[in-house]
Amino acid sequence: MHPDLGPLWKLLYVLVILCSSVSSDLATYFISEPLSAVQKLGRPVVLHCSAKPVTARISWLHNGKRLDRNTEQIKIHRGTLTILSLNPSLSGCYQCVANNSVGAVVSGPATVSADALADFDSSTMHVITAEKKNTGFIGCRVPESNPKAEVRYKIRGKWLMYSTGNYIILPSGNLQILNVSSKDKGSYKCAAYNPVTSELKVEPAGRKLLVSRPSSDGFHILHPALSQALAVLPHSPVTLECVVSGVPASQVYWLKDGQDCLSGSNWRRLYSHLATASIDPADSGNYSCVVGNNSSGDVKHVTYTVNVLEHASISKGLHDQKVSLGATVRFTCEVHGNPAPNRTWFHNAQPIRPSSRHLTEGSVLKITGVIMEDSGLYQCMADNGIGFMQSTGRLQIEQDSGQRPVIVTAPANVEVTDGDFVTLSCNATGEPVPVIHWYGRHGLITSHPSQVLRSKSRKSHLFRPGDLDPEPVYLIMSQAGSSSLSIQAVTREHAGKYTCEAVNKHGSTQSEAFLTVVPFETNTKAEPVTPSEASQNDERDPRDGSESGLLNLFPVKVHSGGVELPAEKNASVPDAPNILSPPQTHMPDTYTLVWRTGRDGGMPINAYFVKYRKLDDGSGAVGSWHTVRVPGSESELHLTELEPSSLYEVLMVARSAVGEGQPAMLTFRTSKEKMASSKNTQASFPPVGIPKRPVTSEASNSNFGVVLTDSSRHSGVPEAPDRPTISMASETSVYVTWIPRANGGSPITAFKVEYKRMKSSDWLVAAEDIPPSKLSVEVRSLEPGSIYKFRVIVINHYGESFRSSASRPYQVAGFPNRFSNRPITGPHIAYTEAVSDTQIMLKWTYIPSSNNNTPIQGFYIYYRPTDSDNDSDYKRDVVEGSKQWHTIGHLQPETSYDIKMQCFNEGGESEFSNVMICETKVKRVPGASEYPMKELSTPPSSSGNGGNVGPATSPARSSDMLYLIVGCVLGVMVLILLVFIALCLWKSRQQSAIQKYDPPGYLYQGSEINGQMVEYTTLSGTARINGSVHGGFLSKGSLSNGCSHLHHKGPNGVNGILNGTINGGLYSAHTSSLTRTCVEFEHPHHLVNGGAVYTAVPQMDPLECINCRNCRNNNRCFTKTNSPLPVVPVVASYPQDGLEMKPLGVMKFPVCPVSTVPDGGQIPEECLKDSVAPAPTQRTCRQDNTSDINSDSTEDTAEFNRGDSSGHSEAEDKVFSWSPLILSPVLEDCSEKTAWSPPGPPLDGLSVVLQQAQET
């Protein structure tokens, strides 16, 4: 039977309660704190933190701000913080906070950073010479790396990982070669290896080592060339390097502060170097490497200044204290370190800021008038950059009866006119009765009891010479639980926030009120001082024995005579001038500042002071101020020597005898610099007095983010500020920064920021009532993955300004929902192009549906030289998920690269894409022309989501346009060539048809005379020429139509080769018309021996040859429309090789150029006479003008006899074919017909036959 365990369980329960109550009363302390980490982007990071007692709750801080458990990409579970995917926004300082009912403590900072390995400096290959059997030195400038890179060397294609043999890799990364030999010559390349990312980068150029014969040049210190200063951590290994050539290592000596440093120390010799395994702070000092012989005086040395750093430490820390309410507490924290550490105080894990009750004096924190809220845990943290230390102390406060203050009547917001009197009241209750304090924008407001109210005059404070910024005068009247703050003669400087704080030993409470000061619109006279006010003015505190206190509080303008002028007594400082100049100038280096005078305050304006400086709206940097003094009578100032396309800020104030007024502010932008060859004309200025209200649409605004307001409108409303710039504050918040412009003559009272989410048409207020001193505001609670635009509004007493131009779209990092699935399919690289000798541009496509529409966060672009076979040589660029193209920079000229991609999100990376190979361009020669490349831009995704990436819509490149132009030109040329070929073919076919149906002449097959043939052909024009033919077919004139027939006569010895010259026939330039005469060659012996005449005959016009159809020579006429008569080429259409022209006997063939003949067919008798005189009564064959050609024939004959060289050269190369033909001349008007002998008579009897024919 089991015993009853009821009482035992009750006892155990009571013990647990007691233990928990005891543990809850224990102060919290850390068992383990987070450690710094270096990790690759996109990889997870885990931080651990644990504290005692076990009831302590753990929370985390990032860069001093508390992390929410629902923060994207961060997972918090008890004392473990996990960064799921490291990105730049998550890098920084992390601290854990442990708290319980006693208080809270904060851990030391742990830095989380992304790995980094910079590139080697691009340099040319250096040639190094080392002497044989001596020491060689290869220098290496190791690039920056996080963490520190490991140095390796590639020697003649082989890797050297560690010091081996005669190769020593020094801690500085340099390489020392001992006992150099011929086999050591070759190429040496230094490499840096990042142990976190396993990334290896090799020096691009390297060194080339040449080995020479030993020489007697003496000894040299190769490294270091100059004295060095080292700062090292304590207890770390240190090597002081000294590479010497020309002497053995035994002749190298090391001295510390002039004494031998090897005896009795931890230092040892390592070849010619000095090394220690653990250095101590006592080892700090000057170390010298001495080489040479002191006796001979030939000594060389180099010095190291070693500074051993010390971690921060606390020699005297905090201890627990227990005090009563209202007491004063002091915590002491003495720190040491090298360099001197910074000391930071914390109360319950919150930094302590100095106040009236919390004061820091050296190593002491002093708290006066402690209250219950001051109880808890206090920490002193010392940090000097190489280490931190902390000490914790607990403050307990004894409780007694009482009540914390409660404000029952809070001060109200007040709006008053400039110069009026205002009073703010505040009442509070508590036990004990609380004390009430007032705070303004300058801190705690104090008031001496002697201060009294002044008259309610509407004027500003008058300044004495030398008083630049007098403190505003206030009057505080307080009693138990009640207080009032009075301000007389309110000015614009008094506007702002006022805080009422009620404090007793149990705590404090606060209430706020805003004071708004509006300008006084009308001129008023000085109000008289009433007797009561005068009596108040004469009141003095007995403790104040002089009037100096009042004079300091109410300074006045003191003149040389010592009497204040009445006009000055009622005058005030002038108002801000109204700037009329536009915010943009058409000139690149000058600007005309034009203004209008504001109210002068009752005194004339003596001068204007204009200050201007350049602003860099891209980086926020500003230039130095330039100040110009302008006489008060002027209203215009020309600013010169400005920079083109730059933004400038102008501040302008008016000064009178009373003082300087409120400043007017303006920002303007200069225009672009115009090139000398530009043909663009400058836009004309608009006519004065005809204002044009610009369109303030976001789409059409192109004024560099400036909204141009109407220059003729001077209602006092400020101008719209410049386009705001957006920068990331955290994952879900941004900083909106802007630059204000002219204030419209009235001070700016507030700013307002609006935002709009893309795909939404509503503008919402992000922040309002922003003080005018702030030009930046943080907008929180933005939705991850969304795209926003922002704009700014300026407010003064006259109202709101125009809205500024909307900012450029800003996409918040992350996604609305978490996606744990990583993408599988990567992007596809569609195009690569080398845009310069160091840049390659690539485009890609990504189809979300290939990964089930899983959104992606961005792309990884990997690239390495093609000749590399090591995956660690790949470099990586990270690109946003909305991009569709990227330009890889910092590449080597004329080098081929392998390029591949991945897409990634929070779940991981996708598979690799296709690999593209692209080679950079040849390095441009200095001085060669270089054409700017058009900027490629990809419009943001319309969805605002990095995963929904559509096809690229970037504009066409200039190279594509060049290809298009060349293709069009070639196409037009090919088209013209095809048309030309078609025309040639058509022309050829036309000529073939013409030659087929309209031959140049028809040959009649006559009788053979002793085996010889006589050729006849028609002729358009002939002349009486001794042995030559004149008026050939190649003359410039048009050949006359007709039926004229020419009978050729050939002398003995004429063969088939034309050895003579045809003058005036084939190539004659004469133009002639032939007469209708009977022409006969009666002097055949004048022809050149061995020559022959051949003349082409044009066709006859159909109208002239109607009657030729009855001619008995069977010649035919064909119709030819509107074209010159064809000519027969010199060479016959059908040449026959070996054809010989037989000589004929002397014959006379009378020719009668007629169209018709009688039926009898007989030739008239006059046509057969030896005389060649034409018959005047003869009927002609055509109605042409007749002309005597005897003179022409004479000239041509003479020309022929001279032997024209040109005609001769043409004819010599021609072989003429003579077709056998005998033409029977038919004469229209001849009554007789010549009887021809039948073929068959011998050649010798030819003359007899012809003679008989003549006799008949």
From Swiss-Prot:
Domain of life: Eukaryota
Main localization, broad class: membrane
Biased segments, Basic and acidic residues type: 537-546, 1199-1212
Tissue expression notes: Detected at low levels in stomach, spleen, brain, large intestine and lung.
Stated induction or repression of this protein's expression: Down-regulated in actively dividing cells. Not detectable in suspension cultures. Accumulates only in cells that are attached to a solid substrate (in vitro).
Location of the Fibronectin type-III domain: 573-674, 720-815, 823-923
Record topology, Cytoplasmic segments: 985-1256
Listed transmembrane segments: 964-984
Positions of disulphide bridges: C49-C96, C140-C190, C242-C289, C333-C380, C426-C500
Region (Disordered): 522-550, 671-696, 929-952, 1174-1212, 1231-1256
Annotated InterPro entries: FN3_dom (IPR003961), FN3_sf (IPR036116), Ig-like_dom (IPR007110), Ig-like_dom_sf (IPR036179), Ig-like_fold (IPR013783), Ig_I-set (IPR013098), Ig_sub (IPR003599), Ig_sub2 (IPR003598)
A biological process from GO: embryonic body morphogenesis
Effect of V777E: Fails to support induction of the Sonic hedgehog/SSH receptors PTCH1 and GLI1. The mutant protein retains some residual activity during overexpression. The mutant protein interacts with SHH, but does not interact with PTCH1
Topological region Extracellular: 25-963
Outcome, altering I787A: Fails to support induction of the Sonic hedgehog/SSH receptors PTCH1 and GLI1. The mutant protein retains some residual activity during overexpression. The mutant protein interacts with SHH, but does not interact with GAS1
Residue ranges of domain Ig-like C2-type in the record: 28-113, 119-203, 224-305, 310-396, 405-516
Keyword ATP-binding attached: no
Compartment list: Cell membrane
Compositionally biased residues, Polar residues: 1177-1192
Glycosylation sites: N99, N179, N286, N293, N294, N342, N427, N570, N870
Annotated membrane topology: Single-pass membrane protein
Alphabetized PROSITE patterns for the sequence: FN3, IG_LIKE
Annotated function: Component of a cell-surface receptor complex that mediates cell-cell interactions between muscle precursor cells. Promotes differentiation of myogenic cells.
Quaternary structure and partners: Part of a complex that contains BOC, CDON, NEO1, cadherins and CTNNB1. Interacts with NTN3. Interacts with DHH, IHH and SHH. Interacts with PTCH1. Interacts with GAS1.
Name this protein carries in UniProt: Cell adhesion molecule-related/down-regulated by oncogenes
Organism of this sequence: Rattus norvegicus
Gene name, Swiss-Prot/TrEMBL: Cdon
